[in-house]
Amino acid sequence: TDADRPINYNEYGAYTQLTKKLMDDRLKFTGSIRYDKSKNFEGNYSPRVSLVYSGGESRKHNFRGSFQTGFRNPSTQDQYIGFNVGSAILLGSAPDNLTRYKETLPVSVGFGQAFAGGATTNITGEIAYNNSYTAASVGAFSATGNAALLKKTNLAFVKPEEVKAIELGYRSFIQGMSVDVNGYYNVYNNFIGNLNVVAPLYGKAQDAPAQPSPIGANFADLGVRSVYAIAKG
């Protein structure tokens, strides 16, 4: 959404690490932490600790374990895209992107223009977030004509993806053969994905409206918005 004005966006970070050897250098401890700050998100700390122990007379048996956290900030596209692809509008979900995206769209002749007050209407990204229905509920309404099936969307702004990771491993060289065994366990939160919503060009979106007509006569004035939001699992 940089057609009218540039997108000012900044990130910065800092990293430090400490290494200490113990037990006649058989045990190696490494601890590190990284701090990252992005304009649209709270700062993130990413700590990591690891231990490596070398056993045996020749120290050929190496056992290791580590714990760390990490994150991935949403890309600039996740946050600031605003692109009409015809069948949908791809919309990034940075808070200020909702007002950056603006477009004028035609309204159907007859009921639509009478309700909207003209042949066109101006939309912004705020419509997708604050005045839209879930695509699944609109599909159910389309199939049955039952407005009680319509569900208003409840969207959260995109957040950084997060991961917590544990790793255990063993490595050695035994009788001319290299042995390397690793195990991982990761827990992810806040996966980023697309979520389709359907926004009326006029009228107020609400759960189970008594009259379906405000969402657009014969679906002529419904628009699909493909929104970047947190994927719910």
Residues covered by each model-derived region:
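Structural signature of outer-membrane beta-barrel domains
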Residues: 1, 11, 36-40, 68-74, ...
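Flexible, surface-exposed loop regions and adjacent strand-edge segments
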Residues: 2-10, 46-50, 80-87, 196-205
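Surface-exposed extracellular loop regions of Gram-negative outer-membrane beta-barrel proteins
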Residues: 5-52
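Outer-envelope beta-barrel architecture signal
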Residues: 25-29, 45, 59-63, 175-179
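Outer-membrane beta-barrel translocator/channel fold
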Residues: 56-158, 162
